[in-house]
Amino acid sequence: MKKIIDNYNAWAYQYDNNINPTRDLDKTVTKESLSNIDFFKVLELGCGSGKNTEWIITKADKLVGLDFSKNMLELARKKITSKKVTFINADINEKWPINNNSFDLATINLTLEHIEILDHVFNSLFMKLVQGGKCFICELHPKKQLAGSKAQFEENGTEIVLDVFQHSEQDYIQSAEKAGFNLLAKKDWYDSEEDIPRLISFLFEKPK
């Protein structure tokens, strides 16, 4: 995990500005998927530079963003100064420094591909959400991964490819359901001119 964290700390300086169709589509997917859902207290895992935070806080009363990259969070804090937002440097593989039963929405974007064991994340999410709380996930599509796509960036002329773990659609669903969630929706998201979906999204709910 340290290598992945170091890579994201290096990537942070260009993350918002380089050509990245996965990042851009994820932003669109998040807005489209959550625009008709009411939420007030949000837990954003893997908030990164705050690319989705900016829109989410237009609907939320409070947001807590967790990320393992200090440099990404530095960008987020410069970009977002709202008192509604708290950013915390934390590794979601470990215990999360937030209270249980505190949020009605959790979001995870382009993060779980860097997590080898999903169960800890879903179990923790289940505890942090209130009854009826929803969990939105958007990740690189398993088919896109199998085609060789990985998170990567260029630094000083050298291509840096980040370590990722392959998770199938069923891996996400089974881990979430094992934690107690119900699946509400699943959708494939495409680039305009590609046959293979770039992203996959899930919406889960903690039973009321």
Region spans (language model):
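Class I SAM-dependent methyltransferase SAM/SAH-binding core
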Residues: 47-94
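Short alpha-helix
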Residues: 164-180, 186
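A short glycine-rich, Lys/Arg-flanked "PGG" loop and its adjoining helix->strand segment in the class I
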Residues: 119-131
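A short SAM/SAH-binding and catalytic strip from SAM-dependent methyltransferases
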Residues: 105-118
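Conserved class I S-adenosyl-L-methionine
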Residues: 1-37, 39-46, 51, 55, 75, 136-163, ...
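A short acidic, Gly/Pro-enriched loop at the edge of an enzyme's catalytic core
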Residues: 97-105
